[in-house]
């Protein structure tokens, strides 16, 4: 897809999260993601994260993980990419708000590039809303930096809400405004995102 078509494009990102609790401090997870672009018409991206979340302190989670990614290139070529990553996620409660600050360091095993991602999320749970299923509106912002570009090269501003469908299944719907630098030009896109969470 050309840069002209890519700017102001609409995309759909479909995400899943499968979490299996080992004990009070350890949970294993697998998180597949799929993306469509060109006004939802072209499937172009898949990524799966797999790892563990460790509750190191009451206010701090640490998550070592591996990621497999493939995306569509010219000629319908889908080269695989592999990454190792570590998340450090401090969390605090501020009045009725829940605030988290995910700091992710990624290393590309194929291109040897280090990437740092920072995502700050603020959520306000309403536990009795939707007939007891609960409703949690949130806003978030995530910035990207890597040692190849040596600069901040992408930002995602997001707002949405989450709710519990049944006891172990939650749904999150959101809108993301993404700005990404490409050839000294900032390409903007509008993203509709769904996240289905399964907890075991």
Where would I find each of the regions flagged by the language model?
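Short loop/turn motifs that connect adjacent beta-strands in outer-membrane beta-barrel proteins
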Residues: 5-8, 24-25, 59, 93-99, ...
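Solvent-exposed loop/turn segments connecting transmembrane beta-strands
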Residues: 5-13, 36-45, 73-80, 107-115, ...
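Outer-membrane beta-barrel "beta-signal"
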Residues: 85-88, 188-200
């Amino acid at each position: 897809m050309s840069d002209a078509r890519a700017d102001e494009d609409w995309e759909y990102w479909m995400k899943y999260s499968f979490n299996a609790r080992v004990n009070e401090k350890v949970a294993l997870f697998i998180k597949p993601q799929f993306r469509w672009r060109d006004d939802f018409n072209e499937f172009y991206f898949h990524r799966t994260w797999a790892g563990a979340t460790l509750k190191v302190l009451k206010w701090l989670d640490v998550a070592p993980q591996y990621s497999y990614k493939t995306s569509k290139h010219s000629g319908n070529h889908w080269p695989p990419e592999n990454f190792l990553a570590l998340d450090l996620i401090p969390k605090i409660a501020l009045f009725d708000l829940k605030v988290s600050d995910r700091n992710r360091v990624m290393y590309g095993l194929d291109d040897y590039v280090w990437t740092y991602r920072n995502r700050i999320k603020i959520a306000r749970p309403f536990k009795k809303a939707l007939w007891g299923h609960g409703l949690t509106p949130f806003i978030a912002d995530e910035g990207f930096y890597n040692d190849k570009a040596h600069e901040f090269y992408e930002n995602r501003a997001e707002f949405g809400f989450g709710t519990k469908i049944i006891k172990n299944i939650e749904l999150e719907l959101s809108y993301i405004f993404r700005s990404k630098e490409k050839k000294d030009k900032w390409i903007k896109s509008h993203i509709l995102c769904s996240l289905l969470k399964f907890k075991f």
